């Protein structure tokens, strides 16, 4: 999708983590901006789950009116599932910290489902989710400074061994809900 065909939103005055940590006046005098590009014709539905299980899913958004990185996928949540109107059967899991939030939105034009896992907060078993949901692709979207730390590597490794509710049960519940919705004439 060409950038020129996308709706652009710009938020000025973004200071970010560097300013938070240093309170440096030169950073404050030269704030950054957050630019959001929304592809035309792409519809999304985002649901986030708490850190430990799949109970109490909450509706969310892919684009939010925040003046910072929370403009992308509304910030950091342990696990988010984004469903789009792209019908190509492709599914991806993104393991990320906050640096990956902006990357996730670029995937909505290319994937039917996107599973976003913040390795800092999620206690879900990523391998189980990928198997149950038949995820095709996996990408790590992590800032370089964090990617090489022992703590980050340990948290990412834990995603393969953590125990939680079977995601297969969530998929069955979603399938049953879609069937009920189709009987009642409700569309996504």
Regions inferred by a protein language model and the residue ranges of each:
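Extracellular glycan-modifying ectodomains
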Residues: 1-188
């Amino acid at each position: 999708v060409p950038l020129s065909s996308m709706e652009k939103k710009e938020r000025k005055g973004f200071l970010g983590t560097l300013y938070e940590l240093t309170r440096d006046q030169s950073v404050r005098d030269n704030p950054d901006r957050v630019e959001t590009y929304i592809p035309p014709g792409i519809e999304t539905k985002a649901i986030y789950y708490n850190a430990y299980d799949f109970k109490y899913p909450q509706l969310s958004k892919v684009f939010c009116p925040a003046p910072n990185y929370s403009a992308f996928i509304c910030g950091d949540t342990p696990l988010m599932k984004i469903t789009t109107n792209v019908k190509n059967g492709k599914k991806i899991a993104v393991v990320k910290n906050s640096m990956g939030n902006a990357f996730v939105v670029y995937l909505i034009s290319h994937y039917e489902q996107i599973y976003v896992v913040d390795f800092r907060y999620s206690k879900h078993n990523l391998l189980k989710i990928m198997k149950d949901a038949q995820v095709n692709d996996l990408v790590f979207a992590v800032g370089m400074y964090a990617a090489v730390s022992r703590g980050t590597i340990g948290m990412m490794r834990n995603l393969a061994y953590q125990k939680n509710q079977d995601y297969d049960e969530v998929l069955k519940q979603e399938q049953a809900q879609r069937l009920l919705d189709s009987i009642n004439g409700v569309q996504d």
